[in-house]
Amino acid sequence: MAAKDVVFGDSARAKMVEGVNILANAVKVTLGPKGRNVVLERSFGGPTVTKDGVSVAKEIELKDKLQNMGAQMVKEVASKTSDNAGDGTTTATVLAQSIVREGMKYVASGMNPMDLKRGIDKAVAAAVEELKKISKPCTTNKEIAQVGAISANSDSSIGDRIAEAMDKVGKEGVITVEDGKSLADELDVVEGMQFDRGYLSPYFINNPDKQVAVLENPFVLLHDKKVSNIRDLLPVLEQVAKAGRPLLIIAEDVEGEALATLVVNNIRGILKTVAVKAPGFGDRRKAMLEDIAILTGGQVIAEETGLTLEKATLAELGQAKRIEVGKENTTIIDGAGEAVNIEARVKQIRTQIEEATSDYDREKLQERVAKLAGGVAVIKVGAATEVEMKEKKARVEDALHATRAAVEEGIVPGGGVALIRARTAIASLTGVNADQNAGIKIVLRAMEEPLRQIVTNGGEEASVVVAAVAAGKGNYGYNAATGEYVDMVEAGVVDPTKVTRTALQNAASVAGLLLTTDAAVAELPKEDAPMPGGMPGGMGGMGMDM
């Protein structure tokens, strides 16, 4: 085991604070509409230029072990805020730096760090409650577009695209971001349920121009096993043929004689059918088949439920207005399922989302909700160069997270104003002793810091602006983009409540841990072994002069 360096008290804290400051100073220059860019070196290819706080934070790794500990703790603030709320990483970093910096002064003067932390926690809890009171719901397209634009570093075109996508697929719909093929941003919307399985044979195609099979008003047969024997399918095929409607078969697989017969019937025009594999694997496949059954108003024909293919009736088949089957995707539009059943299924999946432990499971469950409740929208990001594409794509993803957060918990005035207004709830707070009161003061001071940094990045005098905003009421604040004092909500400068709340809570949590640290243990740097000596010199010539 390598030897460790153990550092105590002020020496440990001082080094860690240096690390906090290095990271925070690099991140905070990106804050606000007039924030600056940071250039990140890449080991291959060109450098990345970004204004995204969390991207900058993730790149920072310091040589000094103790400094690096401090930096990594603040990096955790940025990452956690980004994961929970999708934005607010720079605000969280600025808040954490301020709480640590102010708190260290009190710790150095001999105050009890534990009481300081209690005071900080008390103030943050009061501020969060006040933020909830200030918050107003985010419902209109205009408000959603404003949130998206602010989060994408004041790019209104991104905000508009996200608002349009949400309008088309609903608040629960899946919105994904992909690289575009042109210079302009594009929005593709898939209405209905889409899953990533295509036709099992190209002979099913009936629209050669688009290379898809289109079924109008079809029945949908759902089966959880392989189908290889045509005898199993015959009874249900005869019933569908009598009804004179097309049929989509979704099964674990359709092969051999069964597939060949379906293809022949299709080519001869006897019965229009398409066969596709069921989406997903294992338990997820069963769940997705059940989702499709509920969406189309049918049943999954499975032995577990006592149903068999030979005895299947039309009543057990699902129905839809239209189904499109491509090479890789199947889209079910306007399924005949009961709205009540679909809502109940969505509610059930939501409960599973809350109980899910892994991010992957949560993401897959969220996709299922979206497919049942809304639809799927794809924002294709356009840019001139790959460097610009990466940077823009990251901003679109941030903005998307922020708009989801706004729809979830509402919005507050942006530009650091909400935190200034929330200070009113803390101003009258008192702790049990002087040390707790000092903790409350630390948070009071820290809540000015985001506004100060926005103003500083805009090249103005921070103290004057903070005093002017604090003297105002409600949504009155400073719009750094124009340099004017305005009603922030009317001007479209808004933040999701969840983002501001999460930033404050995470910053206080990590800053509190740093203040109450009294020892740090780090690995000693390995000393490089000296280079081995060179080879001894060659021996003299052996020749003898005659």
From Swiss-Prot:
Keywords: ATP-binding, Chaperone, Cytoplasm, Isomerase, Nucleotide-binding. Its EC number is 5.6.1.7. CDD domains: GroEL. It is found in: Cytoplasm. One of its GO terms (molecular function) is ATP binding. Residues 526-546 are annotated as: Disordered. One of its GO terms (cellular component) is cytoplasm. PANTHER family: 60 KDA HEAT SHOCK PROTEIN, MITOCHONDRIAL (PTHR45633). Together with its co-chaperonin GroES, plays an essential role in assisting protein folding. The GroEL-GroES system forms a nano-cage that allows encapsulation of the non-native substrate proteins and provides a physical environment optimized to promote and accelerate protein folding. This is Chaperonin GroEL 1. It comes from Burkholderia pseudomallei (strain 1106a).
